[in-house]
């Protein structure tokens, strides 16, 4: 069969057209077995630990177990479409996520993909999900308050910017409510800050292993209040694979570090880390890593310590930014001595302990002030708050102690009776409805009233009504006083004390 001249020229043209094109080289392996979200892959000899790999159909996975003849890969997605013999490609990049201001107001998954139906995200940069925490030299002591708007927290368990404060308690004790109120409370501060980025606080909420309906409800609340504008929600829900629930906190922290490293302030809420530990346990057991206490792997402490150490307050040379963390841990039957709770308590700078019993007594937020502590203490409070909040914790502690004794004895001396009366009113004063955060100045005035005896003659059942009336009075007739406390931070004594007393006296006369 002869070759025609036209064919020769066509072949030559084709060869010339393809000349100089480099062949695309991809390192590939083959799936040996797949199941339970784990794939064993042979042939990826040069893969790095934590590297992203790609399966057919665009499904991604992360190489975790690097063994002699195969690699254990956890799959970020549905493993039903992956079968034995499929090719797996190296991406040559460690798991990274988008970061930047474009993420604010959005809901994303553990890899930073939008899941809110509002279109793609134009992120300015990408950051590696699991990075090393800042060292000792770039850090600075926590000294700026991070207001939650909750009287019991801001007065007795103050949280500072750059602190890690654990919220711990049984299910249905109001852990998420405290976190959500903290996000909502930042709205007034962010609006007052205007263009001053050093005063604003951006919020990142990470939902780990929660029901989708719960996350949808939370996002709806953020949208209704306008808080979504400065908030990012990262959701790895109960229906997502375990690797996604494991990765989401790291990915969200990388997104939050963008603010910290640019001299701004961010707050990250992990809701909750118990479920991340369970997801990690599932992955580790399926990867055949040896189990330890409560079947958790040996490095479960490192899982949480390397995550929470990334929250820090940076010094001036590094931009003065901060990342504050509020990790949430769910206990079983109030047992704080279980493995994961004790681990996280030892990593964090204090804990807010919520009790079922208090919750059902109607004391909400159900904070057990005896077991709760902030290891940063009053250095994270304003001078005004510091001067009025000091006696509260002591008086409540004495009240709890005396209340236990008073059950046995009937005849009490006047001093003890006075202590019990004051304690009952202070306990009532610490109650606060959800979605009603107070400003720092309002809390100062309310606590001052409680500790200086303004409530001693008010019946316990009327304390809530008295407080609501006082807040209304302050917001309408004493705006100058609230502005003074906010703008000129100083101890409550002398002139300022007289101003507060005058406002309280005026209100006390009118209250009936």
Swiss-Prot record:
Organism domain of life: Bacteria
Classification via PROSITE patterns: ATPASE_ALPHA_BETA
Membrane topology classification: Peripheral membrane protein
InterPro entries: ATP_synth_asu-like_sf (IPR023366), ATP_synth_asu_C (IPR000793), ATP_synth_asu_C_sf (IPR038376), ATP_synth_F1_a_nt-bd_dom (IPR033732), ATP_synth_F1_asu (IPR005294), ATPase_a/bsu_AS (IPR020003), ATPase_F1/V1/A1_a/bsu_N (IPR004100), ATPase_F1/V1/A1_a/bsu_N_sf (IPR036121)
GO CC term (a single one): proton-transporting ATP synthase complex
Gene3D superfamilies named among the record's database cross-references: 2.40.30.20, ATP synthase alpha/beta chain, C-terminal domain (1.20.150.20), P-loop containing nucleotide triphosphate hydrolases (3.40.50.300)
GO molecular function: ADP binding; ATP binding; proton-transporting ATP synthase activity, rotational mechanism
Catalytic activity annotation: ATP + H2O + 4 H(+)(in) = ADP + phosphate + 5 H(+)(out)
Protein residues bound to ATP: 169-176
Protein EC: 7.1.2.2
Key words, A-Z: ATP synthesis, ATP-binding, Cell inner membrane, Cell membrane, CF(1), Hydrogen ion transport, Ion transport, Membrane, Nucleotide-binding, Translocase, Transport
Subcellular localization(s) per the UniProt record: Cell inner membrane
Site (Required for activity): 372
Principal subcellular localization: membrane
PANTHER family: ATP SYNTHASE SUBUNIT ALPHA, MITOCHONDRIAL
Subunit structure: F-type ATPases have 2 components, CF(1) - the catalytic core - and CF(0) - the membrane proton channel. CF(1) has five subunits: alpha(3), beta(3), gamma(1), delta(1), epsilon(1). CF(0) has four main subunits: a(1), b(1), b'(1) and c(9-12).
Function: Produces ATP from ADP in the presence of a proton gradient across the membrane. The alpha chain is a regulatory subunit.
Family: Belongs to the ATPase alpha/beta chains family.
Name recorded for this polypeptide: ATP synthase subunit alpha
Organism listed in the record: Cereibacter sphaeroides (strain ATCC 17025 / ATH 2.4.3)
């Amino acid at each position: 069969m002869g070759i025609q001249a036209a064919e020769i020229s066509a072949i030559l043209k084709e060869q010339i057209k393809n000349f100089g094109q480099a062949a695309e080289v991809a390192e590939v392996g083959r799936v040996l077995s797949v199941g339970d979200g784990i794939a064993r892959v042979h042939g990826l000899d040069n893969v790095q630990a934590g590297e992203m790999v790609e399966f057919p159909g665009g499904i991604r996975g992360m190489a975790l177990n690097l063994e002699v003849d195969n690699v254990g890969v956890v799959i970020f997605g549905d493993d039903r479409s992956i079968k034995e013999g499929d090719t797996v490609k190296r991406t040559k990049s460690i798991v990274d996520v988008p970061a930047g201001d474009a993420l604010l107001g959005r809901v994303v998954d553990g890899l930073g993909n939008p899941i809110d139906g509002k279109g793609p995200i134009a992120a300015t940069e990408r950051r590696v999900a699991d990075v090393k925490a800042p060292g000792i030299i770039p850090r600075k002591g926590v000294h700026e308050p991070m207001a939650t708007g909750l009287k019991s927290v801001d007065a007795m368990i103050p949280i500072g910017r750059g602190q890690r404060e654990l919220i711990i308690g049984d299910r249905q004790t109001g852990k998420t409510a405290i976190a959500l109120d903290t996000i909502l409370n930042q709205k007034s501060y962010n609006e007052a800050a205007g263009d001053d980025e050093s005063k604003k606080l951006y919020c990142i909420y990470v939902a780990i292993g929660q029901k989708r309906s719960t996350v949808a409800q939370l996002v709806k609340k953020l949208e209704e209040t306008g808080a979504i504008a400065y908030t990012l929600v990262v959701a790895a829900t109960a229906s997502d694979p375990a690797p996604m629930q494991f990765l989401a906190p790291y990915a969200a922290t990388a997104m939050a570090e963008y603010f910290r490293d640019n001299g701004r302030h961010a707050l990250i809420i992990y809701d909750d880390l118990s479920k991340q530990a369970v997801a990690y346990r599932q992955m580790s057991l399926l990867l055949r890593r040896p189990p330890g206490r409560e079947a958790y792997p040996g490095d479960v402490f490192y899982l949480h310590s390397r995550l929470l150490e990334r929250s820090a307050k940076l010094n001036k040379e590094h931009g003065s930014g901060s990342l504050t963390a509020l990790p949430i841990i769910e206990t079983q039957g109030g047992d704080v001595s279980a493995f994961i709770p004790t681990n996280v308590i030892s990593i964090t700078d204090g804990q807010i302990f919520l009790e079922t019993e208090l919750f059902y007594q109607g004391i909400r937020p159900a904070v057990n002030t005896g077991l709760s502590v902030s290891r940063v203490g009053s250095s994270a409070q304003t001078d005004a708050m510091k001067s009025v909040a000091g006696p509260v914790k002591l008086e409540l502690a004495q009240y709890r102690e005396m209340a236990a004794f008073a059950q046995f004895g009937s005849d009490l001396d006047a001093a003890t009776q006075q202590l019990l009366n004051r304690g009952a009113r202070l306990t009532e004063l610490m109650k606060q409805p959800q979605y009603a955060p107070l400003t720092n100045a309002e809390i100062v005035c309310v606590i001052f009233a409680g500790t200086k005896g303004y409530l001693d003659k008010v019946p316990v059942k009327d304390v809530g009504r008295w407080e609501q009336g006082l807040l209304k009075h302050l917001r309408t007739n004493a705006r100058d006083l609230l502005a003074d406390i906010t703008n000129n931070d100083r101890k409550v004594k002398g002139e300022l004390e007289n101003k507060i007393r005058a406002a309280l006296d005026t209100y006390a006369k009118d209250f009936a």
